[in-house]
Amino acid sequence: MSDETVASVAQLYLGNILYALERAALSLEEDNRRDDAAFYRGIARKLAEARGRERGAQAEAR
């Protein structure tokens, strides 16, 4: 059995996840679904901000 968690996998692939969310948002914008695009960008923003806070806390701990 693996010790992987959702958080550890998401952290490992965060850049790929953010890229995929932006690609989805761009595609939705092309289909004039701006509200849906904004929703996916909002998810990406929350993930990126959480990672930034996490890195800041790690830097302070050093």
Which residues make up each language-model segment?
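Short linear sequence elements within intrinsically disordered, low-complexity coil regions
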Residues: 18, 44-45
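Short, charge-rich amphipathic alpha-helical segments embedded
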Residues: 45-61
